[in-house]
Amino acid sequence: LIDKSEEFPSKKIVSIFVNPLQFDDSNDYMSYPKTIEEDLEALEKREIDYVFVPTREEMIENLTESNQLPWGFSNLLCGSYREKHFQGVQKIIRELFQIIKPDFAVFGEKDFQQYLLIKYINKQYFQKADFQIILSPTIRMDNGLAFSSRNIRLSDNQINHAAVAFQSIKNTVLDYFHETSLFNFENLIPQPGRITYQYVKLYNEKYLFDKHGLETDDNFKQKNFRLFIALVIDDVRLIDNYRVERYDVT
């Protein structure tokens, strides 16, 4: 995200806050990696102007009530598995933007549904035409697994196992889709074992924007699709997505 931000002429502020409102399971919140000292040490080596590390009380005590989110945030992808997750994210991101008042904000492509939420928050509450929300490409390990805060909870063996699982189901589903133009992937998903797939979904990007209360912009087209995968390896949940470009199912 920092590398991507360097493309834009602006002061750079990194915010670090593990949002308790976005966790449905208190155990998940407690086990989520919190590496503030390591983060600050790493940031010292980068050209960052400010680091914003608010306390829980500073971010939560005086939150403004937020509106109900569009259908997609509770019925599609992570929204269908994590009740009130995006409502919790909305409250904190809205507060963050009110405090910082950014001209640019950089978010990762791996969390694509969160990116849609950020765009919705700007549309709903700020309506700043000159506020640019930047989508930063997913950074991957050599084995193809997307970097994630949760990876720190995985052993080397688990990391390699997860990478194979993502790549395998991706190849299987896309081969099937390109051959048939069908979306019924249920029979292609392996039975739960060490790895359990929560969802494997392929959506048209315009459909995603529509269902999340947004209009499609020039970077997202009718003919582009995106494959979303969520899996749990042992007790660690990982997500990823891949853009499928220029495939016309009509």
Pin down the residues of each PLM region:
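Phosphate/ribose-recognition catalytic cores of enzymes acting on nucleotide-derived substrates
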Residues: L188-T250
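Nucleotidyltransferase catalytic core that binds NTPs
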Residues: L1-R194, Y207, D235, Y242, ...
